[in-house]
């Protein structure tokens, strides 16, 4: 009886009477009878915003399959493809049709009927209430009426008048665009991003803007994500890695325009110390031209080299400060013979292709110069003060984790198939305990106040998660950037 009373008291917080409870039970049982909503698992976005957004809007072919199912014997292939294109990119397709259609009102009427049919088809897995929530605010009533039309003759005129009014009021373009967006939202019920929004692609910032507006999304962080999270938290090694990677892929629009990172200090520093250096081996790979912030190849190469040296110094300092990382083999600046221009790795000597290191003291190669310290302070401030970057990273924290119950990163294992023990900050952990602890430390790195105990160690750990051999996010033995 006591247990029943406790349950009843809990129910009473949300349901004032028995009828309210019965209503919810009926509702939940009915939902369980519906098919499971479509879940979309996608990984390794790597900043390729256009490809990713197209994949989500098209639901990886699900929408095209619905069109084939509905209109395969009714419309020609060209019309079916045009309808699909309208859903994927409504503004562009409408603009194209305006150049070729003699009477747009006829086109509008036809495609609205067709889009309603497609929308009705993709919404069959959901309750009417859930569908209504996915419809645009100002058109939800109209679309709801059209979606739940019947074949009664006395209602046909009513539905036809709705569409005629949309066209005559001059809002057909926006109505069609919103209807197309609704189809895309209904085609994918839940989106799982399994690692690496960021990397070499031109606009991870556009991907994040898109995902923030998406109705239901979660993240499993990848190592490219965590290095950005570490950079936003102010870790110098993470900042240097992020800048080096994106400069090397010519992503200046994203850095300076997208996130407002001030690269002027780095440009000035690079010209001062590498102004006579061709930096041949640091020239960027140009996959996408910058529209708003073009940077010359030589300037970019000098910036790339300047920040790469800062990266190697910052990483060396952290490796020496954290012997528990077991990354001593990545201490390479002290293995360089600066007089002869060679480096010793694993007992072998190699000649360096680039031998100009004006900011490295051979006697203390991991020490920053005063100019480098000033540069890195200014770059760190720019990352920490970027409103858009911090908003995106907070979204990654609020909607993401190191793992989820139905997927995981690279779990450290022994050769015998057992969970491998990993020592972090004096704690020896494995399996789920390791994941939970790392997840806790990543959150502490970002949200712990500056200069608080454990803040620096936690942010340093984010760098280790980017490239450490036992990192669940990396999954390899080593990162060979210098080589």
Write out the residue ranges for each language-model feature.
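Feature recognizes metal-dependent phosphohydrolase scaffolds
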Residues: 1-483
